[in-house]
């Protein structure tokens, strides 16, 4: 309560204002914000209004539509201003009052008899909202008071207690109202009718503020009336009206009247029951069960009966709880549950109905059919009290929707105990019908507990508790209605216990559909039988309420903004807010469009959709129907269509509802490739898309409050009929889940740990989430779920933990979990793993390397730092230069150094003869790159897929170029994807691709000079055995016009020369050159493992393996120790096929030698049969030998070489070389070998070609110079290409 000491000293000075009359429904003075600050006004402070008449005292509020400029204007209600004597536009002086007295009691008087009668009918509304209309009062003042939106009365302030010039109404102020009755009219209502008349208008007992209706100058023997002024003249008052009024008040507050006379036992309760049934209420209508509680449930002790198990609360659809709450009315009715379409279908299957009946049950349901089909449900009806909130709105809804098909008239709230006992699930549909049976008075009751009671409790204790409960729950005018058996909860020593309250009949005929009344008065002549032994309680294991096992939006991470915007769309579609109901009532439900959530596999689109449904279920009280389309894939079209129809019918039945079609693209999507357009699955998807489109059209025409959410991998993966811009726009809100960035990955990881372990993440002191998020680039939501499981497994494998609370994860656990883990988004992406090469394995190209590091490597290493740059980062680089200068090698090295995923695309492999397939291939490759980001997308031979537009007769490359332009510089842009392109003919590329924002950085890879050639030779020969006389400086000086690829070929030829020289020096007989060459090929590892001349600037793995250089012929033939190696490759059955031959026999049949090695090896006796036979292959699945083609022989030789190298490295043959034994000749490359090889090797690019490339690149770098040299002149108006 505001005390006068708090307001002491508040305010100061005054201000002259202009009075403006308004239609506000209150007695406040509305002041602008500037004037409030000027007068230093406090809340609930009084203001003195001074003008030519007697000053007035008013309360103030701050106006919301005043402008900051202009004169001071004070707005006031027109009726208030006129009663005070103010004029519209007049000048008054406002002065803040420093002291305000809180009134303990205020005497008021209606201004006329009409005001008194209106006050009697709307006493509750006045009590509830009086403080919202007036706070400051003063004697002899007349104020208007609004009892509803259109009706107001005038009251005059008679006196204030304590006496003061003005005072403030508080919540505990007693309001004494003097009646103003008509003299010549007598009230002829009976006592019961008078009580009933007042009871139905009673609204809510507001805490603290209690209204006392008193009269002056009444007879001294009237109960409950006090005399306040004996000297005043006697006012004629209708004594019967006042007496009935006070009897009503005594009944409401459970006051026991001293003189209650009844003509017959129970007649009063029966008459009250009949009077309630005579009210005009919308009985025999259909309502939807909701979980939101109406205003009437919050009433105090006077209406505590409404809290009990026997009352339900009905209110209209658009009831606003924060607005003025309407008064409620109490009646009795029968409640029966109606079966939903899904329940009817289940019942049909159980009853094995005829085909005609089954067809009838599957037809759409309307309100008339519902009423006729459920007459048999009357036997299961329950009679109870019905509390009607907003009765006027419900009656208006019946009038306005008389010619419109409306399923539900309003909403009904049923207490959980009563709802579960009646087997009514949430959001079910019930029908309330009038009670046509006259109630009876029970003569005997039986109370029996449904659970064990304390041993020291007695029957009298149970009776006492039951009598107390009945007194608090019922009154004479509001008796309790029970059927044959009810379940109630009584307060015992051990808390609330459930009891069975049943009627004891004297004969069996009384059990036919009777209802009974109970009240404290009737209980005096009713016998109560108490049984202390608990009755057998039937265990009902089935849960009738539909529980959504979904996560909330707050439990997800990385999709907060996306979830909020999606929930906003669903909220507006279901008219979940007042603004939506005012502005979007014509486009509610599916008319507002469906929501489509797209994202890659494992991105969390289904989890997000379920979380949105969970929020709609909790906040909007919406029913949720989920259809898992993945489970419907492969079924017949009729079954899928029937499942969708049942789901939508169930949603309409329980509206407002949300229908979730999870993975819709699996049953109504496009084929993966154009070749499958006429496959059976594609035809079924098309038919299903048509059926779903027609179904949605039908429900849109019905105007139902149903929202639709669908998930798919992309908008393009759905059938075009569902996402078409023409016809019905089904999906008007599309939300795409992007791959998470580092901050979002940290949020997702934190929430996954919380959901898994149900603990506080702050207790994991040794867990660095930022570090784990940085190491999980390219991960999506599902990957984090698996990663946390792997981390938990790693923790449990290191330490035995008994409870979940003791489980503490660390960064080490996640590091172990990341080993060998491939994210789901990368499993379907064909990534290319670059070779294990670093910058130290590249010779020359220093400037190019620095550009790549600044553009790609540093932003990938420090993303937070580069994210703060105000300019857009470059994401596209074109590498151009002559063949063999190391362009492809640079792409692989930068991918390895930056630790990003690498996707390599050869130009021609994107082109297709089908229309649209090439563009789709370009889109797919960028989608793969987005899924694998951070990623480097490398286009080799770029000129083959992006030539100048207009030069292709088919138009395929033109469409590819257009698609590349869209992907490289689209509206959404590339995030985390760098595009590298390599070409030797940049002049052939469409210039539009080389403009800023696309491949805006063109880097020239020049041919190596002498210094660069020396670096390349050092890198390539790093693992080769070189003799001491080798002078690479001299080799670099005499290799002009050699590229990196040419230098690699030079070392390769020098290696062959060294091999030939070693064979000759070993005393071998002269043989053909092809034999020697073939032998060397079988004993060497090639410098260039993969084809492609651009990988030539350096290669650290291309050296000759020392373990394979030894020329001892015992290594060529497999001995017994290496027998298992051949079994590993050729299969386990080759031994049985060859018999128990020796190793030489096995070698002669299984060893795969070079195809050219068909002659005798010189100096190797006894081995003639070894290489004379053609290579064959024996496997476990085939009998006999299989002839190999040339390609299969080459592949077989390469695989055997790899197996030999791995086997020898594991068996430690290198170490065995140092053991005592025969001395093996070592291979070494000398200067003579290099010079001899140089004589046989020539550059791959001639001098004329070098000149052409030089002119070409010069003109590409300086386009103006090219135009000047060409001398081309353009005439005005001449048509030229913009390319």
UniProtKB/Swiss-Prot annotation:
Q: Which residues bind ATP?
A: 599-606, 881-888
Free-text function comment from the UniProt entry: Component of the PEX1-PEX6 AAA ATPase complex, a protein dislocase complex that mediates the ATP-dependent extraction of the PEX5 receptor from peroxisomal membranes, an essential step for PEX5 recycling. Specifically recognizes PEX5 monoubiquitinated at 'Cys-11', and pulls it out of the peroxisome lumen through the PEX2-PEX10-PEX12 retrotranslocation channel. Extraction by the PEX1-PEX6 AAA ATPase complex is accompanied by unfolding of the TPR repeats and release of bound cargo from PEX5.
Kindly indicate whether the keyword Chloroplast belongs to this entry. Answer: no
**Mutating residue 581 to P: effect?**
In HMLR1; results in mild functional decrease in peroxisome biogenesis
In Pfam terms, one family for this protein is AAA_lid_3
**Keywords, comma-separated and alphabetical:** Amelogenesis imperfecta, ATP-binding, Cytoplasm, Deafness, Disease variant, Hydrolase, Membrane, Nucleotide-binding, Peroxisome, Peroxisome biogenesis, Peroxisome biogenesis disorder, Phosphoprotein, Protein transport, Repeat, Transport, Zellweger syndrome
Name the chain's protein.
Peroxisomal ATPase PEX1
Species the sequence originates in: Homo sapiens
Q: Does the keyword Endoplasmic reticulum apply?
A: no
How the protein assembles, per its UniProt entry?
Homooligomer; homooligomerizes in the cytosol, interaction with PEX6 promotes dissociation of the homooligomer. Interacts with PEX6; forming the PEX1-PEX6 AAA ATPase complex, which is composed of a heterohexamer formed by a trimer of PEX1-PEX6 dimers. Interacts indirectly with PEX26, via its interaction with PEX6.
Cellular localization per UniProt: Cytoplasm, Cytosol; Peroxisome membrane
Q: What is the effect of changing residue 664 to P?
A: In PBD1A and PBD1B; decreased binding to PEX6; impaired protein import into peroxisomes
**InterPro entries for this protein:** AAA+_ATPase, AAA_ATPase_domain, AAA_lid_3, Asp_de-COase-like_dom_sf, ATPase_AAA_core, ATPase_AAA_CS, CDC48_domain_2-like_sf, P-loop_NTPase
């Amino acid at each position: 309560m505001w005390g006068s000491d708090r307001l002491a000293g508040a305010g100061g000075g005054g201000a002259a204002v202009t009075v403006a009359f308004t239609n506000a429904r209150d007695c406040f003075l509305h002041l602008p914000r500037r004037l409030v600050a000027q007068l230093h006004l406090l809340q609930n402070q009084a203001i003195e209004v001074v003008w030519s008449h007697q000053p007035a005292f008013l309360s103030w509020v701050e106006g919301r539509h005043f402008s900051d400029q202009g004169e001071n204007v004070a707005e006031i209600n027109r009726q208030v201003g006129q009663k005070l004597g103010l004029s519209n536009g007049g000048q008054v002086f406002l002065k803040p009052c420093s002291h305000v007295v809180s009134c303990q009691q205020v005497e008021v008087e209606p201004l006329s008899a009409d005001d008194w009668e209106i006050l009697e009918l709307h006493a509750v509304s006045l009590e509830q909202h009086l403080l919202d209309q007036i706070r400051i009062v003063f004697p002899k003042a007349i104020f208007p008071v609004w009892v509803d939106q259109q009706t107001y009365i005038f009251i005059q302030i008679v006196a204030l207690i304590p006496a003061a010039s003005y005072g403030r109404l508080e919540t505990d102020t007693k309001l004494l109202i003097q009646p103003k009755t008509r003299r010549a009219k007598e009230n002829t209502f009976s006592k019961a009718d008078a009580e009933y008349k007042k009871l139905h208008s009673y609204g809510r007992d507001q805490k603290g503020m209690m209204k006392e209706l008193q009269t002056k100058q009444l007879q001294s023997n009237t109960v409950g009336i006090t005399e306040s002024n004996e000297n005043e003249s006697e006012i004629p008052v209708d004594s019967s009206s006042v007496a009935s009024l006070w009897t009503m008040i005594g009944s409401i507050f459970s006051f026991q009247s001293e003189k209650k006379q009844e003509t017959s036992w129970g007649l009063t309760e029966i008459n009250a029951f009949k009077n309630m049934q005579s009210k005009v209420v919308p009985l025999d209508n259909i309502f939807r069960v909701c979980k939101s509680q109406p205003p009437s449930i919050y009433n105090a002790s006077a209406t505590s009966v409404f809290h009990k198990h026997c009352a339900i609360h009905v209110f209209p659809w658009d009831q606003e709880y924060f607005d003025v709450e309407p008064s409620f009315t109490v009646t009795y009715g029968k409640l029966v549950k109606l079966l939903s379409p899904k329940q009817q279908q289940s019942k049909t299957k159980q009853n094995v109905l005829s085909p005609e009946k089954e067809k009838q049950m599957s037809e759409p349901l309307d309100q008339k059919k519902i009423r006729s089909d459920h007459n048999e449900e009357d036997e299961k009806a329950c009679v109870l009290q019905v509390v009607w909130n907003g009765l006027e709105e419900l009656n208006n809804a019946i009038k306005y929707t008389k010619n419109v098909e409306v399923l539900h008239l309003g909403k009904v709230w049923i207490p959980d105990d009563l709802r579960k006992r009646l087997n009514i699930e949430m959001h079910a549909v019930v029908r309330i019908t009038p009670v046509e049976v006259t109630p009876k008075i029970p003569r005997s009751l039986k109370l029996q507990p449904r659970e064990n009671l304390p041993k020291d409790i007695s029957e009298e204790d149970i009776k006492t508790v039951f009598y107390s409960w009945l007194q608090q729950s019922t009154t004479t005018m509001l008796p309790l209605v029970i059927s044959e058996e009810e379940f109630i909860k009584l307060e015992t020593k051990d808390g609330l216990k459930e009891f069975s309250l049943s009627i004891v009949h004297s004969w069996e005929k009384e059990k036919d559909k009777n209802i009974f009344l109970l009240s404290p008065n009737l209980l005096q002549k009713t016998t109560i039988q108490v049984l202390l032994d608990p009755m057998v309680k039937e265990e009902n294991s089935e849960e009738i309420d539909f529980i959504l096992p979904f996560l909330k939006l707050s439990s997800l991470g990385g999709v907060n903004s996306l979830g909020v915007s999606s929930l906003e769309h669903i909220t507006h579609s279901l008219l979940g807010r007042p603004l939506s109901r005012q502005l979007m009532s014509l486009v509610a439900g599916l008319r507002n469009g469906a929501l489509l959530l797209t994202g890659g596999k494992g991105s969390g689109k289904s989890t997000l959709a379920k979380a949105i449904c969970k929020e709609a279920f909790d906040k909007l009280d919406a029913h949720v129907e989920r259809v898992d389309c993945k489970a419907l894939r492969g079924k017949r079209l009729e079954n899928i269509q029937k499942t969708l129809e049942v789901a939508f019918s169930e949603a309409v039945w329980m509206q407002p509802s949300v229908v979730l079609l999870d993975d819709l693209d699996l049953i109504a999507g496009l084929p993966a490739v154009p070749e499958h357009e006429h496959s059976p699955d594609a035809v079924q998807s098309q038919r299903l898309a048509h059926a779903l489109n027609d179904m949605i059209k039908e429900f849109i025409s019905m105007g139902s409050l149903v929202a639709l959410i669908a998930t798919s991998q992309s908008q393009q993966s759905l059938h075009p009929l569902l996402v078409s811009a023409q016809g019905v726009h089904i999906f008007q809100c599309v939300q795409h889940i992007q791959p998470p960035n580092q901050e979002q990955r940290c949020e997702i990881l934190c929430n996954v740990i919380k959901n898994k372990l149900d603990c506080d993440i702050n207790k994991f002191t040794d867990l660095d989430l930022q570090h784990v998020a940085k190491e999980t680039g390219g991960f999506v939501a599902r990957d984090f779920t698996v990663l946390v499981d792997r981390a938990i497994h790693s923790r449990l494998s290191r330490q035995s933990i008994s409870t979940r609370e003791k489980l503490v994860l660390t960064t080490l656990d996640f590091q172990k979990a990341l080993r060998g883990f491939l994210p789901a988004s990368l499993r379907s992406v064909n990534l290319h793993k670059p070779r294990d090469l670093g910058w130290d394995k590249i010779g020359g190209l220093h400037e190019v390397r620095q550009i790549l590091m600044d553009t790609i490597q540093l932003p990938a290493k420090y993303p937070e730092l580069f994210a703060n740059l105000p300019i857009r980062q470059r994401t596209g680089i074109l590498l151009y230069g002559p063949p063999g200068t190391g362009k492809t090698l640079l792409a692989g090295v930068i991918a390895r150094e930056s630790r990003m995923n690498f996707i390599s695309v050869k130009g021609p492999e994107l082109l297709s003869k089908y229309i649209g397939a090439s563009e789709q291939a370009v889109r797919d490759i960028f989608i793969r790159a987005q899924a694998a980001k951070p990623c480097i997308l490398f286009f080799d031979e770029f000129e083959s897929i992006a030539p100048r537009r207009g030069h292709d007769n088919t138009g395929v490359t033109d469409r590819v170029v257009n698609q590349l332009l869209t992907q490289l510089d689209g509206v959404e842009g590339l995030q985390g994807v760098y595009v590298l392109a390599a070409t030797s003919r940049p002049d052939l590329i469409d210039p539009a691709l080389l403009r800023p924002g696309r491949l805006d950085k063109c880097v020239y890879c020049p041919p190596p000079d002498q210094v660069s050639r020396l670096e390349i030779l050092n890198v390539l020969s790093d693992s080769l055995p070189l003799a001491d006389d080798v002078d690479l400086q001299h080799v670099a000086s005499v290799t002009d016009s050699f590229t990196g690829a040419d230098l690699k070929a030079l070392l390769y030829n020098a290696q062959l020369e060294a091999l030939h020289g070693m064979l000759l020096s070993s005393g071998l007989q002269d043989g053909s050159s092809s034999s020697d060459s073939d032998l060397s090929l079988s004993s060497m590892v090639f410098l260039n493992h993969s084809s492609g001349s651009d990988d030539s600037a350096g290669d650290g793995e291309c050296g000759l393996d020392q373990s394979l250089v030894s020329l001892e012929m015992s290594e060529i033939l497999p001995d017994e120790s290496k027998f298992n190696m051949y079994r590993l490759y050729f299969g386990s059955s080759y031994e049985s096929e060859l018999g128990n031959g020796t190793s030489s026999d096995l070698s002669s049949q299984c060893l795969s030698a070079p195809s050219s090695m068909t002659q005798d090896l010189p100096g190797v006796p006894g081995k003639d049969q070894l290489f004379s036979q053609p290579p064959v292959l024996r496997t476990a699945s085939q009998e006999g030998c299989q002839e190999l083609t040339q390609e299969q022989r080459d592949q077989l030789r390469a695989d055997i070489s790899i197996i030999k190298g791995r086997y020898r490295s594991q068996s430690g043959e290198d170490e065995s070389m140092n053991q005592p034994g025969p001395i093996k000749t070592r291979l070494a490359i000398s200067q003579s070998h290099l010079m001899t090889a140089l004589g046989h090797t020539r550059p791959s690019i001639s001098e004329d070609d070098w000149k052409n490339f030089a002119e070409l690149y010069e003109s590409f770098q300086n386009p103006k110079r090219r135009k000047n040299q060409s001398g081309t002149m353009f005439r005005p108006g001449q048509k030229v290409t913009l390319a």
